[in-house]
Amino acid sequence: MPTQMEVEYWRRRYQRMNYERFAAANVIALITHAATQPLDMVRIRSQMLQEGKTFSGLGYQKGWYPFQIMEEIYAAGGGLRKFYSAFDTFFFRTVGYTTARVTAFGYFYDKVNKDPRRVARPDFLVAAGVLGGFIAGVVTNPIDIVYNRMQVDELYPQAARRNYSNTVQGLAKVAEEGALFRGAGANGFKLAAICSSMTNIYDWCKENSYFFFGPHWINRLWGTAVAVAIGTVVSMPFDMIRTRLHTMRPLPNGQMPYNGMFDCFNKIIKYECNSKWMSNFGSFYAGGEAYFLRLFLICYLSQFLVDYYNENYYDQEFWQPQRFHYQSGIDYDIHDPYTDAFNKKLVATYTTAAGGMGAAHPSGKDNLAII
């Protein structure tokens, strides 16, 4: 008869991408990205309106507030469909990004975490996030260029618009320019920053708040908020650079405004972040409110969808291996195959629920009560 630890090992031994994870991850991504796509449109248009201008203050982009941009997009006609540019490109971008990110991260995570019953060390988790995120960003760069250009096309005069009608035409036009991997480095670093920064912070926040609040919904809420805030801070400068490189056009002299990621970074610092013009580093965070809110909603909603998928009934980390002992701190040598959520579920079911361990009570009828 195998022990519970052996059962857990064999049940969790495969940590890479498989058909089940492919289907679950992409369905969840399509739901959450579809619900938050209008915020992505606001984010990228805020970044385009910031180009070439100084940034004074924090929390607004030279007077272009996120909700004002959203209202103007909607008022321009086309209804909600306008926020999605082209449904086929939105679909391919979401599925491609999700598949590449989960596949790459799972591959490297499997390499650094040999025991699937435990969570990898924080530094190993960061390494897997950096490698997996960077590769995913580079691989999905062509479809990102097409989609980003579609999102900002209406900001240009009619004669200067690219007018991509679908994904295939957009990819063909970008390939003619020889720009399929323009900005791929910045795109890779953006995803690397997101994947490597948020998981560890989220775990740390939840583990420490559990000591004070117990199994409460506030743990998930504030842990997600803190992780997304840090993820926004470290990833958005790369996102700004990526947007500039993806959407740039030749200047009147025939030259491109940016010669690469580092040149773009230096020019933003020199012309848009210069303190002589009452500006600051906030130029890299134009559209930051929409960026943060979208990322938060995606992360927070995804957790509940994963709960539903696993039939956990919103018990947090119901079957995830426990790695935190609340009385003694983190200890990777002690392993309990059951989580606190599962143990509490057992207590609630078999000691207080009707028909649980009533037979063990002296009367044979009353249930045991936890005092």
From Swiss-Prot:
Solcar repeats: from-to residues: 16-111, 120-208, 215-304
Pfam families per record: Mito_carr
Superkingdom of the source species: Eukaryota
Disulfide bridges in this chain: none
Compartments it resides in: Membrane
Gene Ontology CC annotations of this record: membrane
Membrane topology: Multi-pass membrane protein
Family: Belongs to the mitochondrial carrier (TC 2.A.29) family.
Organism placement in taxonomy: Eukaryota, Sar, Alveolata, Ciliophora, Intramacronucleata
Species: Oxytricha trifallax
Membrane-spanning residues: 22-42, 89-109, 126-146, 184-204, 221-241, 281-301
Main location: membrane
Name assigned to this protein: Macronuclear solute carrier homolog CR-MSC
InterPro entries: Mito_Metabolite_Transporter, Mitochondrial_sb/sol_carrier, Mt_carrier_dom_sf
PANTHER family assigned: MITOCHONDRIAL DICARBOXYLATE CARRIER-RELATED
UniProt entry keywords in alphabetical sequence: Membrane, Repeat, Transmembrane, Transmembrane helix, Transport
